[in-house]
Regions:
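C-terminal extensions of enzymes
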Residues: 93-152
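Alpha/beta enzyme core
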Residues: 1-66, 71-95, 142-152
Length: 152
């Protein structure tokens, strides 16, 4: 056995996030694996909106990480504002890796610059002030885009 924490990855429903919290996991990793494994799997944004609506207390019980479809800093800010602790990148660094270490470094530099710009545009100095503050996300617009109607 290991003393390292075990974090379930690939969690795709609000119910499963809640279940992981109830079972005592220290964190969960919401991921639809970039939508490439299961067609029509819910995005991290969809799952987070459901968690916020159905089980808002979960954000105080465990850490939540997410990835899937993250291409720009605005995606990172959206996920942070919806309550995640960390955002993973997958496809973008893989594509950048075609150019080796220099390509990945360039990608991360671009994302860092975008993040600084996005934060300045919303009047924040760092991403810690955004985390868990859904007022930075037009959730009604996101709900309309993903679900076709407001959830509340």
């Amino acid at each position: 056995m290991t003393s390292l924490p075990i974090v379930p990855k690939g969690v795709k429903t609000a119910h499963d996030v809640k279940l992981c919290a109830d079972l005592g996991f220290p964190a969960v990793y919401i991921s639809n694996h970039g939508g490439r494994v299961v067609d029509m799997a819910p995005t991290a944004v969809e799952v987070l909106l459901d968690v916020r609506r159905l089980y808002p207390e979960v954000f105080d019980q465990i850490e939540i990480y997410a990835d899937g479809g993250v291409r720009r800093a605005s995606h990172i800010i959206t996920l942070l504002a919806l309550g995640v602790r960390a955002v993973g990148l997958g496809r973008s660094p893989m594509y950048a890796n075609v150019y080796g270490e220099e390509g990945v470094s360039k990608l991360l530099s671009i994302i860092k610059k975008e993040l600084t710009t996005e934060l300045a545009l919303i009047g924040e100095a760092n991403s810690n002030n955004v985390r868990g503050n859904a007022s930075f996300v037009n959730t009604r617009r996101v709900e309309l885009e993903f679900f076709g109607a407001p959830l509340s």
